[in-house]
């Protein structure tokens, strides 16, 4: 009788817990970027944050959304991808505005060739629409160029998915690429820290949140018997996170001053 009497309470409580868990799944992934966003706004310096992190997450979440059309998964994971894409675009917008404001004589980089009389005296001849030169790609001076690049990638990937949606091999490969790309999340930051021999400007809170979140996620995969690629990619993410934390410790205790050299507009940009 007592158990039956509590039934009316347990059902809505279970529903509430499910809603909270779904909300945490949707918005939890963007929490690590809040302190980094606030630090950039406060200091007006984005040199410590690698915008290639945004590139990795944009590609991973676009692929995950396309994967959903071939193999439906839980709605919170789909909404998580949408929220993450919007968050990364906001991060790119802020970083672009801050860097352009701080670079008075920067040579503008553009994803799409456009005619502008105001820029003719400031820039060399325009590059092709798709400029995948590693020295210039993803180093543009206008947020609109990043948006155009994201839309172009989404359009091409979406069209290929539309043509191959009936192939189980393609759909599974698409899902694997989405997970593997996300596993590479910390690599741009790891490389940026190594290249500059410094973690100055990087939010340690962000990396700690990465590590705790990836550790929890990987443990969940292992304990619940998730597909092997999920567990392997999760372990790889944790290893990269720990490597970044190791860099923060090493560079803080053994700082290395870079040799003086002439600053070139293209090389002055952080990854």
UniProtKB/Swiss-Prot annotation:
> Which residues does the UniProt record annotate as the domain PQ-loop?
14-80, 149-215
* Annotated membrane topology: Multi-pass membrane protein
Indicate where this protein is primarily found. membrane
Residues annotated with Phosphoserine modification: 110
Q: What does the entry list under GO cellular component? A: cytosol; endosome; membrane; trans-Golgi network
Q: Cite the entry's keywords alphabetically.
A: Membrane, Phosphoprotein, Repeat, Transmembrane, Transmembrane helix
Locations listed in the record = Membrane
Q: Which InterPro entries match?
A: PQ-loop_rpt (IPR006603), SLC66/Scramblase_ANY1 (IPR052241)
> What GO terms describe the biological role, i.e. biological process, of this protein?
phospholipid translocation; retrograde transport, endosome to Golgi
Please give the start and end residues of each transmembrane region.
7-27, 49-69, 72-92, 143-163, 168-188, 232-252
Q: What is this protein called?
A: Solute carrier family 66 member 2
């Amino acid at each position: 009788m007592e158990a039956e009497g509590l039934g009316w309470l347990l059902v809505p409580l279970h529903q509430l817990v499910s809603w909270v868990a779904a909300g945490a799944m949707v918005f939890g992934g963007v929490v690590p970027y809040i302190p980094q966003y606030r630090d950039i706004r406060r200091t007006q310096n984005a040199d410590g944050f690698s915008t290639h992190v945004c590139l990795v997450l944009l590609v991973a979440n676009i692929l995950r959304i396309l994967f959903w059309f071939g193999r439906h998964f839980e709605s919170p994971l789909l909404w998580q991808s949408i929220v993450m894409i919007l968050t990364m675009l906001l991060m790119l917008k802020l970083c672009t505005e801050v860097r352009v404001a701080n670079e008075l004589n920067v040579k503008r980089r553009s994803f799409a060739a456009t005619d502008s009389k105001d820029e003719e005296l400031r820039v060399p001849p325009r590059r092709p629409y798709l400029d995948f030169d590693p020295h210039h790609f993803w180093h543009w001076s206008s947020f609109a160029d990043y948006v155009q690049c994201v839309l172009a990638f989404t359009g091409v990937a979406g069209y290929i998915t539309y043509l191959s949606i009936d192939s189980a091999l393609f759909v599974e490969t698409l899902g694997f690429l989405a997970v593997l790309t996300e596993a590479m999340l910390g690599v741009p930051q790891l490389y940026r820290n190594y290249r500059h021999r410094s973690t100055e400007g990087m939010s340690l809170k962000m990396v700690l949140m990465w590590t705790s979140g990836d550790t929890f996620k990987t443990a969940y995969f292992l304990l619940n018997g998730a597909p092997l690629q999920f567990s392997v990619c999760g372990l790889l993410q944790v290893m990269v996170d720990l490597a970044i934390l190791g860099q923060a410790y090493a560079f803080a205790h053994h700082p290395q001053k870079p040799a003086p050299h002439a600053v070139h507009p293209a090389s002055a940009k952080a990854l």
